[in-house]
């Protein structure tokens, strides 16, 4: 009872804090950027991380197993993964380049997890025999970390496509400066140092230069984050194959979840391959990553919504039955 109450409190604390963080970011975007509010939002994400960590640890203690056994627990862990990705660049150089993506992603996943749709999953149950394995932590955690990284990288690619195909005059107005502030990494300072070079350039050339710099940074960080997610995904698939052999007697069973995991892996393998070809970098590779964004959600939610296959643990169908 105590652990259940503590979990309930931590859930509401983390959701409330991240809601405040989103509000602060919207204020900076729509009204005016304030350094104090920006620092407060970063500290809020740190507090959210510790709240979700406490939530996972609490559920781990009273359930007796690592909290990755159903859709509710996996969504909480996915939200926790987004908060990690949010904090890593901040602690490295006190700048956050992913705040426009990670904070909304975290509140979306946690909001869905705590919604009424998954109420019956909030109570921990005894694991079925197939899930009572040391591979549970390894396989599922790697898959969810890969989903978080690949989703963030894919959203960066989506942003790249939006900027690439919009008119230059719309890119650098007041309404879009939030994304610019997130990814310019000192390009403004560089331009000030090189002001003499740009004195005779037209406004179109100036905005085109900024657009080029922004898309290059988006492409660069999308590649780095997706590469990390691809490594996690590969480890997750391989560890899952070993676990499947122990549980079901075969490394690969062509289960719907396995098929979509392979499709996801193939899509991002194609993305990484296109990045090795200089002529295909930028918008071309971003299109592949954007397709991958949709594939990830199909892979993650598809089986849980349909409740079919060997990976249907914690699905909506299973719970309703």
From Swiss-Prot:
GO cellular component entries: chloroplast thylakoid membrane; plasma membrane
UniProt GO BP: cytochrome complex assembly
Principal location: plastid
Pfam families listed in its UniProt record: Cytochrom_C_asm
Signal peptide interval: none
GO molecular function: heme binding
Subcellular location: Plastid, Chloroplast thylakoid membrane
Transmembrane segments: 9-29, 44-64, 71-91, 98-118, 143-163, 225-245, 252-272, 286-306
Record's bilayer topology term: Multi-pass membrane protein
Keywords, comma-separated and alphabetical: Chloroplast, Cytochrome c-type biogenesis, Membrane, Plastid, Thylakoid, Transmembrane, Transmembrane helix
Cited function: Required during biogenesis of c-type cytochromes (cytochrome c6 and cytochrome f) at the step of heme attachment.
Family designation: Belongs to the CcmF/CycK/Ccl1/NrfE/CcsA family.
Subunit record text: May interact with Ccs1.
Official protein name in the record: Cytochrome c biogenesis protein CcsA
Organism per entry: Acorus calamus var. americanus
């Amino acid at each position: 009872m105590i652990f259940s109450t503590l979990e309930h409190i931590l859930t509401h604390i983390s959701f409330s804090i991240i809601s405040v963080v989103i509000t602060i970011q919207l204020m900076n975007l729509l009204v005016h950027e304030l350094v104090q509010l920006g620092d407060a939002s970063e500290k809020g994400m740190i507090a959210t991380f510790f709240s979700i960590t406490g939530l996972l640890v609490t559920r781990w203690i009273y359930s007796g197993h690592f909290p990755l056994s159903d859709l509710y627990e996996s969504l909480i862990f996915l939200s926790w993964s987004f908060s990690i990705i949010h904090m890593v660049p901040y602690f490295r150089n006190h700048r956050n380049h992913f705040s426009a993506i990670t904070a909304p992603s975290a509140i979306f996943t946690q909001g869905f997890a705590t919604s009424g749709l998954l109420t019956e999953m909030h109570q921990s149950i005894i694991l079925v025999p197939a899930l009572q394995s040391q591979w549970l932590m390894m396989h599922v955690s790697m898959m969810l970390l890969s989903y978080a990284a690949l989703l963030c990288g894919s959203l960066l690619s989506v942003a790249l496509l939006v900027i690439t195909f919009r008119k230059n005059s719309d890119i650098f107005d007041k309404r879009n400066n939030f994304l610019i502030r997130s990814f310019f990494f000192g390009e403004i300072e560089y331009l000030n140092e090189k002001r003499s070079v740009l004195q005779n350039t037209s406004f179109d050339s100036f905005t085109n230069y900024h657009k080029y710099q922004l898309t290059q940074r988006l492409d660069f960080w999308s590649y780095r984050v997706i590469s990390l997610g691809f490594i996690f995904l590969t480890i997750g698939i391989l560890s899952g194959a070993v676990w499947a052999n122990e549980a079901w007697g075969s490394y690969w069973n062509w289960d719907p979840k396995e098929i979509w995991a392979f499709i996801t892996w193939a899509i991002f393998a194609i993305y990484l391959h296109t990045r090795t070809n200089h002529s295909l970098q930028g918008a071309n590779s971003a299109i592949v990553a954007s397709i991958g964004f949709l594939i990830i959600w199909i892979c993650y939610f598809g089986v849980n919504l349909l409740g079919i296959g060997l990976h249907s643990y914690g699905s909506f169908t299973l719970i309703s039955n």
